[in-house]
Amino acid sequence: MLLHGVTISFAVISGEFIWVDIMRYIIAVPTYNGGAVWRESAKNIIAFGAESQFVYVIDSGSKDDTLNVAKSHGFKTLSIESKDFNHGGTRNLAVENNIDNADVIIFLTQDAIPQPGFLEKIMAAFDDPAVACAYGRQLPHVDANPLARHARTFNYGATGYVSDMGSKDTMGIKTVFTSNSFSAYRVSTFKEIGGFPSSTILAEDMYFAAKAVMAGYKVAYCADAVARHSHNYSPAEEFKRYFDIGVFHQDEAWIRQAFGGAGGRKEIYSFGTELLIKKCAALDSYGMY
C-alpha cells in the first residue's frame, strides 16, 4: 500500500496484520522541452499514486513550459545546463541528491506516461531483497507506428519474471535487459555497484544491470507496472540508434562476453569498427529500445 512517500508491505499471520517492510521512494525525471506528452505524464504521475513532494525533476534548460509544468504540480526541481546532461551522470545526480531520502529511486523519462498502479506495482519488486533493479512494461503510445509497436511487443511481454546469473543460458543478454524509460533501483545496491557510467552514449541501464547480476543480484521485470512509451523514429533516426547500440556493445564487450546474445545466441558480428546486426528483432533483444 502507498502512504505519504512510502510503500508498506504487510502479511496476515494468525488473523493479524504484521508490518513487514516500509520503503521510501523518489520518482526522478530528466526533462528537456517535454511538450504535451510531458504534461500528460506529469498529470498521471500524480493521478496514479505519487505525491508531488516525492517527484524530482532535473531539467536541462528547457525553452518551453516543461519546468513550469513540474512546478505547477509541486514537484521538486533542479535546473542544469543542457551541455551538462548525460544519460548516466544526470541520473546519478538525481540519486546523489536524494540518497538520504529514499530506499528506491524510480526513473521515468518525460515521454513515458504512467498507467494506473505503476508505482506500487514496481515497488513490490523490492520485497525480494536480492532485487537490485526493476523495470516496468512499456505499451506503445496511441499514435505509434508499426515499427514502434513491434519494438514494444517484442521486448515487453505480458508475463513478468526475475532474472539472475543462472538465467543467462536460456535468456542470454536479455538477462540484463532493462529500460530507464520506466525503471527502479534499490539505493543501497546502487551505491554498492557504483551507479551508472557517465561515459556511455546510451544503455547506462543495461550496464548497471549487468554489473548487478554479476555481483549476485537480480533484475525484475514487472509486467503489471505499466507506462506508455514509444518513438516514431524516421529511418535515419532508426539507423543512428542501431549504430549507437553497436558502438555501445563494442565499447562494453564484457557484457556480451558474460551473457552472450539474445536467448543465449551470439548474434552480433564484428566488421572493422562497426557492429552488424543480424536482424532488427535480434537487435531489439540487446536491450536498448
Pin down the residues of each PLM region.
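Non-catalytic, C-terminal membrane-associated alpha-helical segments of glycosyltransferases
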Residues: 241-247, 251, 258-289
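Conserved donor NDP-sugar-binding/catalytic core segment of glycosyltransferases
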Residues: 117-149
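Short beta-strand-to-loop acidic/aromatic patch adjacent to the donor-nucleotide binding site
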Residues: 102-113
